[in-house]
Amino acid sequence: MAPTTLLGQKTSTCPYGRQPDLHGYPLNITELAAHLDGTCYVTRQSVESVAAIRKAKAAIRKAFQASIDGCGASLVEILSTCNSGWKLTPAQANKWMQQNMFAKYPKGDIKDTTCLAENARHNNPTL
């Protein structure tokens, strides 16, 4: 079971569904990381469509660039399916993810201070 497995969701290691008293609650990892000092870019993306894959790739590139530029730490969380574990076709799994996971784990940038870091470097070239 992943940290993001939803309550009641069945997995191969949790065949009766995630129960909070037994397995704990799902973790909003990106929201937690966004509050940490030193993070500059925290985002949640998905891979359910070509457009979503392109956004995820751009987010990964941006995270690497932020690291190269010395802006701080980045975290890119990728929501994806587990077709075989969910016993669904890929299309069914994508639909299930859109209908169930996106409500709990909304996609998009949660923290982005990379532009601020870039502006600071331009104002003080020694950074």
Language model: regions and residue ranges:
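Glycine-rich ThDP/TPP pyrophosphate-binding loop and its adjacent helix/strand module
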Residues: 1-126
